[in-house]
Amino acid sequence: MIKPTFLRRVAIAALLSGSCFSAAAAPPAPPVSYGVEEDVFHPVRAKQGMVASVDATATQVGVDILKEGGNAVDAAVAVGYALAVTHPQAGNLGGGGFMLIRSKNGNTTAIDFREMAPAKATRDMFLDDQGNPDSKKSLTSHLASGTPGTVAGFSLALDKYGTMPLNKVVQPAFKLARDGFIVNDALADDLKTYGSEVLPNHENSKAIFWKEGEPLKKGDTLVQANLAKSLEMIAENGPDEFYKGTIAEQIAQEMQKNGGLITKEDLAAYKAVERTPISGDYRGYQVYSMPPPSSGGIHIVQILNILE
């Protein structure tokens, strides 16, 4: 049996608990920016539910969903979509990921929605003419993109384990993209460092994240009208809009125009997969984590076994 004291020590356990939010819970901690000179630890306690993410605005979206009666999966999916707006460095519709879910009845499951290589991918596509690795091809070119899994994964989780409709949990992200939000330290720092190196070669992205010839700065307002439209279409028409509809057509056209490999067929064929988590015993606690293709879950269990 998993001991409650252990689950409370794991940051993500609150999102996997399936509990509803209690009005008696403590207010969210002040936002802490990463990528700066100093971080401050803000302990927070709650009796029924808790939300944690890399971005305070996205975290608040999840808290609001819990307050409105949503469960942990509803909140997690809403936060994921919000991060596609507020944390474009990593959380976005064009990526993928993994999700562990522990339901109220005690079952634990894993959802794999990592990106997949396009059908036309080859083992040497990131090599230059001399056969040497070319980091630009593997990191910043259109070849670096895999078939996205985010939208499919969120939909699978929400349909099977959530309680709210898709348009409800996408709505906060849509509003953030449409109305804009204030750029924080983390995004400003990343735009200054990486945006100056990468974005000048991608005019569509530069048009969003640059203003008056330079990357957006802390305090600027970031509005993403095209992303808002995409989110609205997904909310109204479901994941098929992304994988088989207008958005899929635009992705395929962009790839073909710029040397990428993702096709409409790749997008239409993508499926998120539910898997059985790996598990291990550590000092009497049952630890669950992601199975392959994630490597981290296996390593965690191995390391804990070594420590024991």
Segments and roles (model prediction):
Residues 2-11:
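Bacterial N-terminal signal peptides that target proteins for export
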Residues 10-20:
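Bacterial N-terminal signal peptides
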Residues 21-25:
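Sec/Tat signal peptide C-region and signal peptidase I cleavage site
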Residues 26-60, 72-73, 77-237, 242-244, ...:
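Noncatalytic scaffold domains of N-terminal-nucleophile
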Residues 64-66:
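Long, structured ligand/cofactor-binding scaffold of large enzymes
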Residues 306-308:
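Short, intrinsically disordered, charge-balanced linker/junction segments flanking boundaries
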